[in-house]
């Protein structure tokens, strides 16, 4: 159900807490964030990367689930109750691999797009297999791509470039942004890497870009001891920052932003995507 004016997308940036390995607790938080976004009249809510088990948590090897599956069903029910689109990062199991995946669910709770992270960091490749496909999905508000976190690194822009070439006019990115416990925010402000990367993509293609990170403590895995700090980010098609989440390990928050969207033409198919 659309709530915003034509040409504008109201996005809920669901900067939720994620506790490593606690799928039931995390899914309950995600459901609540979806319902809050519905009350805030959002068209879509974006949730973090690997929100079920936490990014790089060792439980991924044993507790990842199939997509579609029970976890997408839970989130789908929340989407249908709230009447909005949901983007969520989930840990996916297939017969042969575990993937760091993102899903797009429509307001009826149906799965409409699955993306498997292509640019998985070297430190996480013993947990996740890299994805090999790039797709987009046409929705009631435009055409969506789901790059996951480092898929939007500046040296890997080919991933989101391809999504834009397929007609995407908005990139909705589940993320897990973490820092060491020693990082001094005043000496080393967080976020410039993402601001630059998102602005380049936005201005190159006329796309809006939204990245949503979780908050919380990483209690296991290769980055044990690091802090996920939110600082979620929204950039308009002109490359300007129009939304930002609070910074901090405890900074759980729903941030709403009204994003202008541009009508674009798919280079691959020659079709309007606005």
Task: List the model feature ranges, each with a label.
Residues 1-44, 172:
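N-terminal active-site segment of His-dependent metallophosphoesterases
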Residues 13-15, 46, 87, 146, ...:
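Structural motif
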Residues 14, 63, 115, 137, ...:
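Hydrophobic residues at beta-strand termini and immediately following loops
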Residues 23, 27-108, 112-114, 178-208:
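Cys-nucleophile CN-hydrolase/nitrilase-fold catalytic domain and related Cys-dependent amidase chemistry
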Residues 49, 90, 148, 175, ...:
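A cross-domain feature marking catalytic cores of carbohydrate-active enzymes
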Residues 67-87, 153-252:
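CN hydrolase (nitrilase-like) catalytic-core segments centered on the catalytic cysteine
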Residues 93-175, 179-196, 248-274:
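Active-site catalytic loop in hydrolytic enzyme cores
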């Amino acid at each position: 159900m659309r709530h915003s004016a034509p040409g504008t997308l109201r996005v809920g940036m669901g900067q939720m807490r994620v506790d490593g390995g606690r799928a039931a607790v995390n899914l309950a938080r995600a459901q609540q964030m979806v319902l809050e976004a519905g009350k805030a009249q959002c068209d879509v809510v974006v949730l973090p990367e690997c929100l079920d088990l936490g990014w790089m948590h060792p439980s991924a090897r044993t507790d990842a689930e199939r997509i579609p599956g029970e976890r997408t069903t839970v989130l789908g029910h929340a989407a249908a109750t709230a009447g909005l689109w949901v983007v969520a990062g989930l840990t996916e199991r297939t017969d042969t691999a575990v993937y760091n995946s993102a899903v797009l669910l429509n307001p009826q709770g149906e799965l409409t797009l699955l993306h498997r992270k292509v640019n998985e960091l070297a430190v996480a490749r013993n947990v996740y297999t890299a994805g090999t496909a790039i797709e987009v999905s046409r929705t009631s508000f435009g055409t969506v791509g789901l790059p996951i976190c480092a898929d939007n690194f500046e040296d890997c822009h080919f991933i989101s470039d391809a999504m834009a070439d397929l007609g995407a006019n908005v990139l909705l990115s589940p993320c897990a942004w973490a820092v060491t416990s020693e990082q001094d925010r005043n000496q080393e402000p967080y976020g410039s890497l993402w601001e630059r990367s998102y602005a380049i993509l936005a201005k190159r293609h006329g796309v809006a870009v939204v990245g949503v990170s979780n908050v919380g403590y990483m209690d296991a895995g290769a980055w044990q001891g690091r802090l996920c700090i939110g600082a979620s980010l929204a950039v308009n098609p002109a490359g300007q920052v129009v939304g930002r989440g609070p910074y901090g390990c405890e900074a759980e928050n729903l941030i709403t932003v009204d994003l202008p969207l541009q009508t674009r033409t798919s280079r691959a198919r020659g079709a309007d995507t606005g």
